[in-house]
Amino acid sequence: MAQALLVPPGPESFRLFTRESLAAIEKRAAEEKAKKPKKEQDIDDENKPKPNSDLEAGKNLPFIYGDIPPEMVSEPLEDLDPYYVSKKTFVVLNKGKAIFRFSATSALYILTPLNPVRKIAIKILVHSLFSMLIMCTILTNCVFMTLSNPPDWTKNVEYTFTGIYTFESLIKILARGFCLEDFTFLRDPWNWLDFSVIVMAYVTEFVDLGNVSALRTFRVLRALKTISVIPGLKTIVGALIQSVKKLSDVMILTVFCLSVFALIGLQLFMGNLRNKCSQWPPSDSAFETNTTSYFNGTMDSNGTFVNVTMSTFNWKDYIADDSHFYVLDGQKDPLLCGNGSDAGQCPEGYICVKAGRNPNYGYTSFDTFSWAFLSLFRLMTQDYWENLYQLTLRAAGKTYMIFFVLVIFLGSFYLVNLILAVVAMAYEEQNQATLEEAEQKEAEFQQMLEQLKKQQEEAQAVAAASAASRDFSGIGGLGELLESSSEASKLSSKSAKEWRNRRKKRRQREHLEGNHRADGDRFPKSESEDSVKRRSFLLSLDGNPLTGDKKLCSPHQSLLSIRGSLFSPRRNSKTSIFSFRGRAKDVGSENDFADDEHSTFEDSESRRDSLFVPHRPGERRNSNGTTTETEVRKRRLSSYQISMEMLEDSSGRQRSMSIASILTNTMEELEESRQKCPPCWYRFANVFLIWDCCDAWLKVKHLVNLIVMDPFVDLAITICIVLNTLFMAMEHYPMTQQFSSVLTVGNLVFTGIFTAEMVLKIIAMDPYYYFQEGWNIFDGIIVSLSLMELGLANVEGLSVLRSFRLLRVFKLAKSWPTLNMLIKIIGNSVGALGNLTLVLAIIVFIFAVVGMQLFGKSYKECVCKINVDCKLPRWHMNDFFHSFLIVFRVLCGEWIETMWDCMEVAGQTMCLIVFMLVMVIGNLVVLNLFLALLLSSFSSDNLAATDDDNEMNNLQIAVGRMQKGIDFVKNKIRECFRKAFFRKPKVIEIQEGNKIDSCMSNNTGIEISKELNYLKDGNGTTSGVGTGSSVEKYVIDENDYMSFINNPSLTVTVPIAVGESDFENLNTEEFSSESELEESKEKLNATSSSEGSTVDVAPPREGEQAEIEPEEDLKPEACFTEGCIKKFPFCQVSTEEGKGKIWWNLRKTCYSIVEHNWFETFIVFMILLSSGALAFEDIYIEQRKTIKTMLEYADKVFTYIFILEMLLKWVAYGFQTYFTNAWCWLDFLIVDVSLVSLVANALGYSELGAIKSLRTLRALRPLRALSRFEGMRVVVNALVGAIPSIMNVLLVCLIFWLIFSIMGVNLFAGKFYHCVNTTTGNMFEIKEVNNFSDCQALGKQARWKNVKVNFDNVGAGYLALLQVATFKGWMDIMYAAVDSRDVKLQPIYEENLYMYLYFVIFIIFGSFFTLNLFIGVIIDNFNQQKKKFGGQDIFMTEEQKKYYNAMKKLGSKKPQKPIPRPANKFQGMVFDFVTRQVFDISIMILICLNMVTMMVETDDQSKYMTLVLSRINLVFIVLFTGEFLLKLISLRYYYFTIGWNIFDFVVVILSIVGMFLAELIEKYFVSPTLFRVIRLARIGRILRLIKGAKGIRTLLFALMMSLPALFNIGLLLFLVMFIYAIFGMSNFAYVKKEAGIDDMFNFETFGNSMICLFQITTSAGWDGLLAPILNSAPPDCDPDAIHPGSSVKGDCGNPSVGIFFFVSYIIISFLVVVNMYIAVILENFSVATEESAEPLSEDDFEMFYEVWEKFDPDATQFIEFCKLSDFAAALDPPLLIAKPNKVQLIAMDLPMVSGDRIHCLDILFAFTKRVLGESGEMDALRIQMEDRFMASNPSKVSYEPITTTLKRKQEEVSAAIIQRNYRCYLLKQRLKNISSKYDKETIKGRIDLPIKGDMVIDKLNGNSTPEKTDGSSSTTSPPSYDSVTKPDKEKFEKDKPEKEIKGKEVRENQK
């Protein structure tokens, strides 16, 4: 392809399309057709040439073609792509160089390509204004569509739109043709959309179709046209469609699982949700007198009782009457109840009956399969599921919580996250593909360049030489170049040669200058002229300096790394104009919000041995940050511009020669069009924005620069930012006048400080350079806004400006790497998400308009159905804004409530369709793409902002200086003391000194290495400053040497960096000897160039291992630390004699006790018992005296046992070991708590508040179990490893949220108060109460009350935001915000409507981004941890992994004995029938049919229906029993050796029992129909038989793989729930029952607490549980409420404890555990997909062994050689070797044992090798494999190969040759001896036979002479294989002769 592309670039490649061209094409096409033989005309697509991707229609013309001659713009040209040479196409290029491809056939049969009409149409079509016009029309049209009640004149506008669209389509049809050929109008799917829209428009206009609004909604599709017009969107939509295709498997699995769960739900809860509490009929009614007869069943046909007195009572009518149901306040639906003991009970005077409709308008139910499915889908998406959960538990009983646990964990967490995993994978694949494409292009361009170079080498050598000398004769040349850059940019044949010569000269000049350069400016040189040229060329091709891939160049030679100081003495930042780095390296190199002071362009590799140089007084420094790519691009290009101007400027001239040399590299390749601004702007900038007027000014400037750029000033400014943030966060309501004036003054002061900083920086740097940098622009904007705000302080309505001050918080990112990284990730994602966000916006827009058009009217007309007052509810679709809000709410995952409303007013089907579409398309796909992008930007940024950490920022420098100062003072004081008191020689210690070790100076710079100073980096962790963590580099003259010595701010490398900082934190016991110290030093040194990541903890240290694995030699360690012993020498006791020895023996005894397994088991048992005991302390404990007493004693016993354990461990391990182990500390603290409460009880202080709260800490006891259970410990360790980064992200999120919280306080503080009626609890109308004073006037009956969760201060704001971010309780907050007016004013309904947008913005940034970041961090961390502790995986190549996995699977299997076929003829027939695959599949079909019949069941089906279904069920039971009997007959007792059969057997027995004892079972157990549901599990078996189900198998495989890990996480979650349940019971058992707390869901007992906590695990309904706890004083609660049976008084909660309890639980469970779950699933999913993508899967090996069983019925593991061919042919692909396969099998060289048998492993190994191909690693693996196989199958020990198939064949062939020759010899002998009397003819006849034999043997010989066979063997089996069998070969080389003789005759006979 590359070859074909090499049309000479420039105008020559463009040729106008003429009649001749058309004729030529036709001729070529005819020739090609003639050339091809018939057969080859349909060759496979693989080998067909493909169109060039760079010349596709819609792309821009590659740069290599140069400019289009003006006369050829918008004209038909011959196709540039060689692929289309013989196809009838032509191209047209517009001014923007976009390619349009057309068919060269006649359009509409009349317009030839050269027809003037068609030419005009083409000109219009390709013109950019045309697409602009269409774009504007679409947007305007969209605006008109959002009008809910359009005025009449819009009708005419509609016609205009239709007209424009029609015109567009006509133009397209005229230009392209309609539909027959390629590239015609209807060949583009996007045009189908246009076409249908236009047709619909005309149809609706002229034909009356009744429901017009439904059809008018089709106009909405016009919005989709934007996608086809905006270029980037098509690709995103492509990606979306791809991910939806990938989702098909997950979707099927999801639907299947949901169906199964829905069936279970249907069987368990059918009709339950209609159980209501109905009033017991009044005593005087006829009912009372007849109750007995009713219950005895005497009732006439219509449900009426007839009795003696003849008064009638209709029971059905009575219970159908809504007014008799018990309804709680504020609820729409009556209270549900159940008749089970653990179900909800009715109040006094009420009875539980099944009547009325289901809850929520009748839409929440399990009565039919479809409603059950909807309920399950809702559970899976976790929308308002707490409501379903509570209703079901209330109606059916608490035990059914198990059902919900299963559905939530398997359905919700697993399936939803699988969808995420699939989308992320699809995204990743797409990314890979684009990267590969880019690489491929690069290679092609390289090739082109090579070609160009060759073409142009010879032609113009002379001209070029003269040109070069002229060009570089002076600066003038540069100026000219600037002017003529458009010429220079063309890669015309002339310029290419010139480059080379110029470059050579320049090279030599550079070498000379480079050695004697005085100003210290270093230019990294690139290695070869070619590479420079190619790179620069590539750059200009893309116009994107970042496309260079990592391979392109090493960090050392970024093409043009030009120092800022070239341009002016003030700037010493290295800004490279073009830095070619790969994506990964680019991150954080120089950046947007960052100053580019130490933005060195070398990477960490080159940092290591760099020179350290101080910076000059005149240069500015600052901290480093990071840039987005576009920014870098802009800045680079702009700096290129500047450089040119600067050169023209006088100050730059003296250096010009050296610069010129480098600049010209890129000069010719940069087009003028790429300049950011016109040249006049730079001239203006030079004069007005760079202030260099006089010397005095320069001095002032210099001074200001010194001050402003000092790190201490930076530190001060950072402190000011923090203080300012604090001041802003201190606003609250109500605030005193004094406090508020303090805040105002503070604000003024800070504004002043920041303004001064900005002004000084501008003076120091000049405006021109000041605004070159992201951070400074940011500062400038904020300062200007603050000043504006001061000016406009008193203007009403501009308080919004105050919110901009909050952005100052972001300045912290300068010195806080994690925040910086986060902003960067969000920045990157927003860049990548730009298109996605547009697509999302289009989707939201379309659905909002559709909703408005379809349902708007219905909401208006049927509003009384959903609202008693007949007012529109808050969520409706009557206008565009509200419609948009509903769609947005659905995207947040809350769809069910709004859908109920919609279904009630507008009918079920349409609403279901629309809402499901929004839910599936919007929510699942788009939000998951969000996540996928976030995750991918994580992996590319590698979370740890490595580059940032490696650069020191000013803050660290300042802190470092302070640290040094303090150290200096400390050392001085120490020395004084030493001199005064100790006259000893100094011992050299490892310490942080400040001595300079070495100081080498030469003519270029100095390298200084200092001892390390410890700095706290941004995370508060100590990190050594040095190789690993931070390095800066400067280049200096030697005269700067002194300034260096005097400048203490420099940091320098030390050989061990991170290592030393680790020493600081090590425990002393870790190093028992010097050598160990040395070793660890080396170790640490090896890791010292750690990534500097926030996560990267030191490598696991010896101490940790010591803690986990007890010493082998059973010797206790020292009791005390060395420090203690030094200070108190008496602690050291001699263990050799006397008391010391007794003490030592005692310790040894204790040690052996503690280390004993039984001791540990006993302690675990005690821990479990004591934890269990806590669960009994509920509110009923007072009434159960015996239990209470028992528990008190037990508590004491447990406490004593634990104290004893602790003492034993102290004696055994010594204090040092005990107290350096974190788990021991945990034990210690928990024991202390028990001890304190014991002592307090003994002393009678048990009622003290402090003691009571201490007792609640006993809830932590179960934590001790953590260290004892391996599984949980693994998870905890992983979590602890993740804590630093989770904390980091949590902090960043808090900062992020702080901004929204402060903004919320500014907007809503004090405005949520409202006046309520104390009797009814309703809010007063605005007519009655307008403000606070009106409310006061009403006295007792009114109350001025605040919403519980509000924005009155920043803390409350945080809680409110957490509720919004988790979408729980957010409605109330939003309603309050939307209704609010001002402080002390009564709210009005939707007064402040657009406040919704505050929440929308917060949800997007605060919730989607930040909460997903947690997932990102955890997954990222997970991977990092795996890498750190991971096993071989990381050190294996991909190849090796493939083999390893195949082998792993291989080794674990072994052939089994098949079930023998019965000898009895009848049994044998049945056996054959049962073992066929068809039988299996038919049974599966029966199971599915059974499932369908179960789905048909409904709650209120007719008796006849019930009868039919039970008969059908009977049939199924008979069939399944039949299957069972058949299998039993044929398989005999072997039936029970297969797990699945036992399962079938149990199900069949249960079904039969269930059929006969249905009533009995239903009464005491569950509904017997459930047994039939269980049978569905068998469907799992069928998946193996279906080839197409591979995807689903993968998903299930992923689940199986994740189960162990998920079980561990589940255990941990249970532990957390347990602790919180105990804690909740002791704190919230008695709170007032309201909101989410009622008689069933509360913290009164352990069970109830667990039920509540399980619900909050998914963060569902936590607002409801928190609300009652926030009641802290009357009138919200009653502090003196009496609780019968208990001594506790009052039902008030404790808000601070409550908030802490719920927030911490949500963070732990929801963010951590649930996200760990996600991480595990994503991980295993990718592993599983890799597995399934491997050439050999688990199933292939299983299949191999299944076939093997038939050939080896006795499971000997051997097969005879003669059967091998049939065996190979019986396998399935990929292992299959079809017949004829003899030769192949022989060539495999398989080892054989006596009896010509071959072992299964050898065959499998050879076949596997055949599939996987050659590899050198096979030997080692093979040996490994055999070991494993031996271990699992001891029978193979006897296996000693004697020969191999190949050897056997060679033996056979050689035997044949020997025999033949021997026969010939015998014959000759005979001929000699035989007398001549025999006739010659007979002799002829005799000889004939051998001759025939010869021929046969010759043939064989030809096929397999030794050489040939060897050749073929080497192709099918690698030499490595031989090496394994070589020893064997030698072994049986000896036996060969005898064997041959033995075997000869036998074989001959066989032949």
UniProtKB/Swiss-Prot annotation:
Grouped into one coarse class, the protein's main location is membrane
- How does this protein lie in the membrane? Multi-pass membrane protein
**InterPro entries this protein is in?**
Ion_trans_dom, Na_channel_asu, Na_chnl_inactivation_gate, Na_trans_assoc_dom, Na_trans_cytopl, VGCC_Ca_Na, Volt_channel_dom_sf
Q: Which SUPFAM superfamilies match?
A: Voltage-gated potassium channels
I repeat spans: 110-455
Phenotype when changing Y1504E: 2-fold decrease in activity of the spider RTX-VII toxin
- Pfam families, per this entry? Ion_trans, IQ_SCN5A_C, Na_trans_assoc, Na_trans_cytopl
Q: What does this protein do?
A: Pore-forming subunit of Nav1.3, a voltage-gated sodium (Nav) channel that directly mediates the depolarizing phase of action potentials in excitable membranes. Navs, also called VGSCs (voltage-gated sodium channels) or VDSCs (voltage-dependent sodium channels), operate by switching between closed and open conformations depending on the voltage difference across the membrane. In the open conformation they allow Na(+) ions to selectively pass through the pore, along their electrochemical gradient.
Q: Which organism is it from?
A: Rattus norvegicus (Rat)
What name is this protein filed under? Sodium channel protein type 3 subunit alpha
One of the GO biological process terms: neuronal action potential
Q: Does the keyword Protein biosynthesis apply?
A: no
Give the recorded effect for T1506I: 10-fold decrease in activity of the spider RTX-VII toxin
**Impact after mutating E1559D:** Increase in sensitivity to the scorpion toxin BMK M1
The IV repeat ranges on this chain: 1459-1757
The site feature described as Key residue that permits the spider beta/delta-theraphotoxin-Pre1a to inhibit fast inactivation of the channel is recorded at: S1510
Extent of the II repeats = 693-965
Q: List locations, semicolon-separated.
A: Cell membrane; Basal cell membrane
Q: Which GO terms describe its cellular component?
A: axon; basal plasma membrane; membrane; neuronal cell body; plasma membrane; sarcoplasm; voltage-gated sodium channel complex
**Domain description from the entry?**
The sequence contains 4 internal repeats, each with 5 hydrophobic segments (S1, S2, S3, S5, S6) and one positively charged segment (S4). Segments S4 are probably the voltage-sensors and are characterized by a series of positively charged amino acids at every third position.
Which family, according to UniProt?
Belongs to the sodium channel (TC 1.A.1.10) family. Nav1.3/SCN3A subfamily.
Phosphoserine modifications at: S484, S485, S486, S1452
> Which residue ranges have biased composition labelled Basic and acidic residues?
46-57, 510-529, 596-622, 1925-1951
Which residue positions does UniProt flag as site: Important residue that permits the spider RTX-VII toxin to inhibit fast inactivation of the channel?
A: K1503, T1506, L1507, E1562
Tell me what PTMs the record reports for this protein. May be ubiquitinated by NEDD4L; which would promote its endocytosis.
Listed as disulfide-bonded, the cysteine pairs are C864-C870, C902-C911, C1315-C1335
What CDD domains does this protein map onto? Na_channel_gate
